[in-house]
Design a protein with these regions (language model features):
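Catalytic core of pol beta-like nucleotidyltransferases
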Residues: 1-26, 34-41, 50-106
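Short, well-ordered beta-strand segments
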Residues: 46-48
Length: 106
């Protein structure tokens, strides 16, 4: 598994917000926080939501939560279905699964 270049306490905050707002979604991290090239202390965190369901309203609330949080970095939250093919290919080359969809209780 590829290491995620992020402080553990920040990762916990991000995972908690993902679970609160979009527990049903698969979320991948990509970019400099994954591969480490060009990484700076305050580099943003690139996340992509890989879900066929329309989560636009929930993602807006999640974006607001990220902005209002105590995270010292910016979180860019993208939707897979809106990405160009070249960026999808770039993400496929190196990513970290941050969240898998929550399973419904049986």
């Amino acid at each position: 598994m590829t290491e995620l270049h992020l402080e553990a306490r920040h990762l916990v905050m991000i995972e908690q917000m993902l679970q609160e707002f979009i527990p049903e979604a698969r979320v991948w991290c990509f970019g400099s926080r994954v591969h480490g090239r060009g990484l700076k202390r305050f580099s943003d965190l690139d996340l992509v939501v890989r879900d066929e369901e329309d989560l636009h309203a929930k993602l807006g609330k999640l974006r607001d939560a990220f902005e209002a949080s105590d995270l010292p970095i910016k979180v860019d939250l993208l939707e897979w279905n809106q990405l160009p093919d070249w960026l999808k290919q770039e993400i496929f080359e190196e990513y970290v699964v941050l969240q898998e969809p929550a399973k419904a209780a049986i």
